[in-house]
Regions:
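Membrane-anchoring hydrophobic helices of lipid-metabolizing enzymes
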Residues: 2-195
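Soluble catalytic domains of membrane acyltransferases
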Residues: 104-312, 316
Length: 317
């Protein structure tokens, strides 16, 4: 079967669908069948994490389809409306921070955390994370879990990773985000709102937070081998630290931008205009990216197996 299409010069040429399909198929790099079982478990950890929010949405929609569950759904929606735990420090579930899933995610890339200095637990800190990348996986593994033993490295520091307020509007997923994971000291995923930040930094000594400074806008610059940051209009975290007497800890994750490939979107292009318009109305930007698959190395939505190393340095205010 063939299709007649114009070429770049405007002339008509035939395109053989079979040849196109064969060309694409030959370009796919399939994973071997004899991959060691631990690596399969690592891949499964990433798949589960990637599908976490879609599964929560699907579970909510399924619950809506059963009439006998509607009272419970209504009660949960009311609870979502009146509950502001994401602005008050989260809720504690002690075992979740050390859940084996996070170790699988850590080893998949791998992701590591380098300690360069001690932090005084009697003070408060504002961690500024760079770069955002596509999803900030380095921030999640190193600072929202105990996969790399953050609490052991920085004893007495009660760190909370912050995310967009809109993420707490997804049913069921919000409960996972709100879990405080540390068995010894509380740690929860919280809102990045001003109220949330002030509440955390005024809870007492050691209470600290991490902000992914570049936010959604920075994800549009996340290309492998690049280190472009969005900082010029993102100085609110410095004012936050000064207002609350906290010290700044800039953190950079080398390799964060290498985890996915992104469709080129130079400023002024149609793709970038669409992304900026989408961000204006939805508060987050939709990067058009691809990675690897479960059984392929170069096509899919999973991140590539590329190393991420997070390094920080204390700055006193």
């Amino acid at each position: 079967m063939s299709l007649i299409v114009p070429n770049r010069l405007g002339r008509i040429r035939n395109v053989d669908h079979n040849n196109v399909f064969q060309s694409v198929l030959m370009d796919v790099q399939f994973a071997p069948l004899n991959v060691p079982f631990p690596r399969r478990l690592q891949t499964a950890s990433i798949v589960l994490w990637i599908l976490l929010m879609p599964l929560c949405v699907a579970l909510f929609l399924v619950a809506l389809s059963y009439r006998w569950l509607l009272p419970f759904v209504l009660a949960y929606l009311i609870f979502m409306y009146i509950d502001h735990s994401h602005e008050m420090g989260g809720r504690k579930i002690g075992w979740f921070r050390r859940f084996p899933l996070w170790n699988g995610m850590r080893d998949f890339f791998p992701i590591s955390l380098v300690k360069t200095t001690n932090l005084d637990p009697s003070k408060n800190y504002v961690f500024g994370y760079h770069p955002h990348g596509i999803i900030s996986l380095g921030a999640w593994v190193n600072f929202a879990t105990e996969a790399n033993s953050f609490s052991s490295l920085f004893k007495g520091i009660d760190l909370r990773l912050l995310t967009l307020e809109s993420n707490f509007n997804v049913p069921f997923s919000r409960e996972i985000l709100l879990c405080k994971f540390n068995l010894m000291a509380a740690l929860g995923i919280c809102s990045v709102s001003k109220r949330s930040c002030d509440n955390i930094l005024t809870k007492g000594p050691g209470n600290s937070l991490m902000i992914v400074v570049g936010g959604a806008a920075e994800s549009l610059y996340a290309f492998p081998g690049t280190n472009d940051l969005v900082l010029k209009r993102r100085l609110g975290f410095i004012k936050l630290a000064i207002r609350n007497g906290a010290s700044l800890v800039p953190v950079y994750s080398f390799g964060e931008n290498d985890l996915w490939d992104q469709l080129p979107n130079p400023p002024g292009s149609m793709i970038r205009k669409f992304q900026k318009t989408f961000q204006k109305w939805m508060t987050f930007a939709p990067p058009l990216f691809h990675g690897r698959g479960i059984f392929t190395y170069n096509y899919g939505i999973l991140p590539f197996r590329r190393q991420v190393v997070s390094v920080g340095m204390l700055i006193f205010t």
